Amino acid sequence: MPELPEVETTRRGVRPHVKGRRVERVVVRDARLRWPVPPDLARALVGSTIDEVERRAKYLLFRTAHGTAIVHFGMSGSLRVLDAGVAPQKHDHVDVVLDDGKLLRLRDPRRFGCLLYTRNDPHDHPLLKELGPEPLSRAFDGGHLHRLARGRTAAVKTFLMDAAIVVGVGNIYANEALWRARLAPRRRAGRVTRARFDELAQSVKEVLADAIARGGTTLRDFLSADGEPGHFRMSLAVYDRAGKACPRCRTPIRAARVGQRSAFWCPRCQA
């Protein structure tokens, strides 16, 4: 699943090609995504100029003067910038054709993503309005985590992946941040001290910044806007490395299910 670094990589790749461009045509080949593509999407977008491309959590926001298109990649989605003459392939569901001969193509093999439209403030949309702070913002720090963790019995990894606590920290990056902070994923969130949460918040910021700098992580489907895979996979310390040596102490990495998701950690380094 594309996580925050992959979505931010896409935003940075797409923005120079679409900002300031007018939408000439919208082609919907298959509207059957997680939520159906609105039937009036073409009417809403055609003739509009894309004023800005923003990211909120794992959502991309394409702002125009009259409304905002909201894109989520689900499990396997991606956006590509292509010449308008490039023929669509299987799973290429929507094209947004621009006035310079380019198009923005939404591909989603598993169809768990979405492309929606709102004329209101997108931050008030039901999918966005209850989200927690951005992890790379000043609003996210150890104090924020410690305050919300009081009385929580959930594992700290599950707590960290809760979008109401902080957005965009998916499974890959939660595992990596906990390893950097030397915290065991199954420790109860309510028993983590403020000092340890300070370390964890800083580790989250560092992991996400490193991943963005490397274009995200490609495990299966993710490609950036120019068709390139992400390279952060080469830097993974624990994720998907069960039985391999911890980069810090050489102890074999362990794996288990924590909160219905896969967890990877070093039993010696992380406590």
List each language-model region with its residue ranges.
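A cross-family signal for N-terminal binding/gating loops and helix N-caps
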Residues: 1-113, 261-265, 270-271
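Glycine-centered secondary-structure boundary/capping sites
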Residues: 20, 47, 130-133, 182
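Basic, nucleic-acid-binding surfaces and adjacent catalytic neighborhoods in DNA/RNA-processing proteins
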Residues: 22-40, 54, 146-271
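Short, glycine- and charge-enriched coil/turn segments that flank and shape catalytic ligand pockets
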Residues: 38-44, 48, 65-66, 83-89, ...
